[in-house]
Regions:
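Carbohydrate-recognition loop of C-type lectin domains
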Residues: 2-136
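An aromatic-glycine-centered, glycine-rich loop/turn in mixed alpha/beta architecture
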Residues: 87, 107-187
Length: 187
């Protein structure tokens, strides 16, 4: 494993491997952005497991890990003279309103499909590749296809009214589910 950070991918990898004072890893997603706060700075945007926001004290631990802290006797993991500032990702709340023409009677499986898809932790079927990237796009077509996939035989039509357009995530954003409104129309 790596023990020091030089490149942005190094910072991202080491953030995900970091063991906090809690005794466990706390970072699921990380994105390093150079020179946000001036020359020789790294902004490390982080998301906890399941899209959790990281508390101040744990972000400070991660900063001490990268920057070092002589008072606490912590050697810097950053091998360059960059100062690392750790910030939480920005949850991009996405509300969903949809009408589904189907023979199915329960909304729960559709609500679960939406909630699982619009999670910062959502992955493709390979189980390793994250579906959503910082600064990426959340296409309506993916939401619609995901709902058809709940039961391709019994779902006849999906009418997505919210969101009305594809969602563009900010550079520091990942999707988070807002309110879900599913209306079933018997076919």
């Amino acid at each position: 494993t790596k023990s020091g950070a030089i490149t942005n991918p190094d910072f991202e990898f080491l953030a995900r491997q970091f063991i906090a004072s809690t005794g466990s890893r706390i970072i699921e997603r990380a994105k390093a952005i150079e020179e946000t706060f001036g020359v020789k700075t790294i902004e490390l945007v982080v998301a906890g497991f399941g899209g959790a926001l990281i508390p101040d004290a744990l972000r400070e631990e991660l900063e001490n890990y990268f920057n070092g802290n002589k008072v606490l006797g912590i050697e810097a993991a950053a091998l360059t003279n960059h100062e690392t500032t750790v910030v939480n990702y920005t949850p991009q709340v996405i509300n969903v309103a949809v009408q589904i023409v189907t023979t199915l009677k329960s909304k729960e499986q559709f609500e679960n499909a939406i909630a699982n898809l619009l999670s910062p932790s959502a992955k493709f079927e390979d189980g390793t590749t994250y579906r959503w990237q910082f600064g990426g796009l959340v296409p309506r077509a993916i939401l619609i296809a995901n709902l058809f996939d709940v039961d391709p035989v019994n779902v006849k039509n999906v009418i997505l009214t919210t969101p009305a357009v594809d969602i563009i995530l900010g550079d520091r954003s990942l999707p988070n589910i807002g309110t879900i409104s599913v209306t079933l129309v018997e076919s």
